[in-house]
Amino acid sequence: IPGSRINSFYFFVLSLFVIGCGLTCLETSANPYATVLGHPDKAESRINLSQSLNGIGWIVGPLVGGQLLFSGVNIAIPYALVGIFVLAVALVLSRINLPDPRRAHEADTNEMVEEKPMRVMAFGLGMLTLFLYVAAQTGVNSFFINYAEESIHIEKQTASLYLAFGGMGLFFIGRLAGGVIMNYIQPRLVLLVCAILTFVATLIVVVCSGTLSLIAFFALYLGESIMFPTIFSLALRDAGTKTKLASSLLIMTIVGGAVAPVIMGYIADTTGSMAIAFLIPLVCYGVIGGYALLKPSASL
């Protein structure tokens, strides 16, 4: 809200940085908490479900934000509404007697656990892959509307609807379906198929335009859906018993989301083509496919 009054780009960047810090703290605390709220054997199922519900926010966010930001409404209103909603949720949670997750950890410490070393090279490759995924996803999300306006020739408000119901809707459905499919098929193979899908879809986005590119974007979001939790879990398998340290390091890879948009924006400004900028996500998906292909089945 102060940023809308000051009307400074750098103040808006600072505001977004503060929001990002809050979201990072929420992500790092909510995911471990979800693992201890219930039977330990169902921990992975709970995390997948909680991450799948992110898709609902990704649908509502672009829908509401696009309609407000591109309709001439004061830019402070969307952020004020989000702030009020978050404060309301925080107030509700503060009144709920939530179980203490430390009790579960205390119970675990009474059992002897065999120390297993971290496979540093394999885990490092997993970190790099997750870094590139976050970079690709953020780049695609950041420039979808710009690309749609330039190459698909649709208005920004219409593009925001396509992003909300088409892209994010398929992302949500894909993550739910992927959680079920992985009960029958190795996660590595599911990741490989999705990497191939996203690579081909991004290639179409680069070389084509119009309706075909829009369809490719939808396929791209569908393929992206299972990547983050799958890469995260595969990388953790190389962490041995250093899962807490490994989880913290993996969370740090979200900084990739700050890298790709800058590079893609520079390419678009330099070449005058938003489509060429999507070569960056194309390379990222290629590396993800290589990671899934070369990942030893024995480590799954």
Q: Which residue stretches match the model-derived regions?
A:
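Helix-to-loop junctions at the C-terminal end of transmembrane segments
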Residues: 174-186, 268
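Helix-loop-helix hairpin linking two adjacent transmembrane segments in secondary transporters
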Residues: 46-101
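Extracytoplasmic gate region of multi-pass secondary transporters
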Residues: 119-165, 169
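Hydrophobic core of transmembrane alpha-helices in multi-pass small-molecule transporters
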Residues: 9-26, 212-227
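A gly/Pro-rich, aromatic-decorated transmembrane alpha-helix motif that marks the paired
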Residues: 29, 50-71, 247-249, 255-274, ...
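C-terminal ends and interior cores of transmembrane alpha-helices
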Residues: 1-6, 196-209
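Intracellular juxtamembrane helix-capping segments at the cytosolic ends
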Residues: 25-39, 225-240
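Cytoplasmic helix-loop-helix junction between adjacent transmembrane helices
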Residues: 15-52
